[in-house]
Amino acid sequence: MMKRNELKQLQELQLKINDFYTLVMTTKNLDLCNLSALLEFLGINWGVWVNLSTQRDEFNKKRYEYITKANYGLRMALNELLGRNASYDKEINNQGLRKFRTQEYFKRLDFELANEQKSTDIEDTTITFEKVDDNNKLTIKKLINVI
């Protein structure tokens, strides 16, 4: 049996995952500003802020580069949200984004997630929410596959 505190933490995580999943799946253009706001809403200190008033032109010119790096940040933030050990370099580059480790890290992470999905603990865990209908039930497995 789960302790009362663990159950409360799990319920809070379920609500965060539901809000995150809904926002990401309904947002077609998830730019850096929206992404930063989303992660702040989820309570994740991502440290990715761009001063748009002074860097608007720079931001627009390098938008693709920002979004590419933001995708890595999103995966990293999701792993942190799911309680995974998501290590990253703390060096800040000139765009104000954290410099993340190489593709090899993510390949290894994908391998680890694939192995975890084989266990019944993850595969059989269904997260249900009182405020949504049956069509919006979300499994952790489905969320990991979306990542």
UniProtKB/Swiss-Prot annotation:
Highest taxon listed in the record's lineage: Bacteria
Protein name, entry field: Uncharacterized protein UU170
